[in-house]
């Protein structure tokens, strides 16, 4: 299960205490002070690791603390610095403190200092003076810093699936990727985003995100609302998954309502490159006519796509996806319109190649 938000407590280490000691050497009756300083407490860092893509590892591990600094030693030896705490997070993790965004961690291998460890205390060697030749005082180390933070992950996926509840998004991602989401015939089966790795061939693939179904008013927080719309903000291409079998709400109306919610939430999100998947085509009435009408609705010309092993074969592919033009994905037109069936795997194999070509 994908965990997208978690609260943890981070703490830097306490500085080690300074040492009270005096030189003890043969023939030296009253050796001077030689107490060393305490070691600094360990720091807390966040490090971005491209090999992890969830916050699931934080479940059950709430406290993350660096080690304390070691006490100062004799003969002016400084105590060892406390071991740093390195907190590994996936790319795209945002760290919130006191209700405000504190850190935005995007770049792989990036390491950011979050909390500095407490300073080690001074040993008694620092307190010798003309009037006090044998000081018996040393400083305590300074306390570390503790902070409660919230980690929030915006999915950084290549393809983001957008659709109403029960449109078949979870079935689709389980069919073409390694994701295994919960699937059932009722709305809001998906309660958290799912990530799936889609392997096209031995060398190519991409990451797909399935978010909980959008309902009207989602941009205002209804249903599962804004908390999940944010997950598709960083995806490269949107794939609208429409239920071609619905009689109460046609695919044109589904598309218009979904796009309206995206535009209300974020104009930038609504302007992302996109394509349309007409799911459940195997149980839809006259899918060819439906596909033609939808292409006309979007001012596109329906195509015969037998060469792509599509069955049914009517749909639309932008010329750029077929290598006729350079990939400039700033245009508003759809990149693809494809009928498919996630349940019976109709056209799902060809879909992998289409989605790969759609990526910038």
Curated annotation (Swiss-Prot):
Listed GO MF terms: GTP binding; GTPase activity; magnesium ion binding
Compartments (UniProt record): Cytoplasm
Highest taxon listed in the record's lineage: Bacteria
GO biological process, one term: ribosome biogenesis
Cofactor requirements of the protein: Mg(2+)
Coiled coil residues, start to end: none
Acyltransferase among keywords: no
Annotated positions binding Mg(2+): 170, 190
Gene Ontology CC: one annotated term: cytoplasm
Sorted UniProt keywords: Cytoplasm, GTP-binding, Hydrolase, Magnesium, Metal-binding, Nucleotide-binding
Enzyme class, UniProt record, top EC level: hydrolase
Cited InterPro entries: G_OBG, GTP-bd, GTP-bd_Obg/CgtA, GTP1-OBG_CS, GTP1_OBG_dom, GTP1_OBG_dom_sf, OBG_GTPase, P-loop_NTPase
Binding site for GTP: 163-170, 188-192, 210-213, 279-282, 341-343
NCBIfam families in alphabetical order: Obg_CgtA, PRK12297.1, PRK12299.1
The protein's assembly and partners: Monomer.
Family from the record: Belongs to the TRAFAC class OBG-HflX-like GTPase superfamily. OBG GTPase family.
Protein task: An essential GTPase which binds GTP, GDP and possibly (p)ppGpp with moderate affinity, with high nucleotide exchange rates and a fairly low GTP hydrolysis rate. Plays a role in control of the cell cycle, stress response, ribosome biogenesis and in those bacteria that undergo differentiation, in morphogenesis control.
The name this protein goes by in its record: GTPase Obg
Source organism per UniProt: Helicobacter acinonychis (strain Sheeba)
């Amino acid at each position: 299960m994908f965990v997208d938000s978690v609260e943890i407590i981070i703490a830097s280490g306490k500085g080690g205490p300074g040492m009270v000691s005096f030189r003890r050497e043969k023939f030296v009756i009253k050796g001077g002070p030689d107490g060393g300083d305490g070691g600094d407490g360990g720091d807390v860092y966040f490090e971005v690791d491209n090999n992890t893509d969830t916050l699931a590892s934080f479940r059950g591990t709430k406290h993350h603390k660096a080690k304390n600094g070691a006490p100062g030693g004799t003969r002016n030896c400084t105590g060892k610095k406390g071991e740093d705490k390195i907190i590994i997070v996936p790319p795209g993790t945002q760290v919130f403190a006191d209700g405000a965004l504190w850190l935005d961690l995007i770049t792989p291998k990036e390491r950011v200092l979050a909390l500095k460890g407490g300073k080690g205390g001074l040993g008694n060697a620092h307190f010798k003076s003309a009037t006090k030749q044998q000081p018996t005082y040393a400083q305590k180390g300074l306390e570390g810093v503790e902070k409660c933070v919230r980690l929030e992950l915006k999915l950084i996926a290549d393809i983001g699936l957008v659709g109403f509840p029960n449109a078949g998004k979870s079935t689709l991602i389980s069919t073409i990727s390694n994701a295994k989401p919960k699937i059932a015939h009722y709305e809001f089966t998906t309660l958290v985003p799912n990530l799936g790795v889609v392997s096209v061939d031995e060398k190519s693939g991409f990451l797909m995100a399935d978010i909980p179904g959008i309902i009207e008013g989602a941009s205002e927080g209804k249903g599962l609302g804004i908390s999940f719309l944010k997950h598709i903000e960083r995806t490269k291409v949107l794939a609208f998954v429409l239920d071609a079998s619905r009689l109460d709400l046609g695919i044109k109306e589904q598309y218009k309502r979904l796009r309206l919610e995206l535009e209300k939430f974020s104009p930038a999100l609504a302007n992302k490159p996109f394509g349309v998947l007409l799911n459940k085509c195997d149980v839809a009435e006259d899918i060819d006519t439906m596909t033609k009408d939808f292409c006309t609705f979007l001012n596109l010309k329906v195509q015969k796509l037998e060469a792509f092993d599509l069955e049914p074969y009517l749909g639309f592919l932008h010329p750029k996806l077929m290598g006729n033009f350079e990939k400039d994905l700033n245009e508003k037109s759809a990149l693809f319109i494809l009928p498919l069936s996630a349940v019976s795997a109709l056209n799902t194999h060809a879909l992998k190649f289409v989605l790969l070509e759609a990526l910038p």
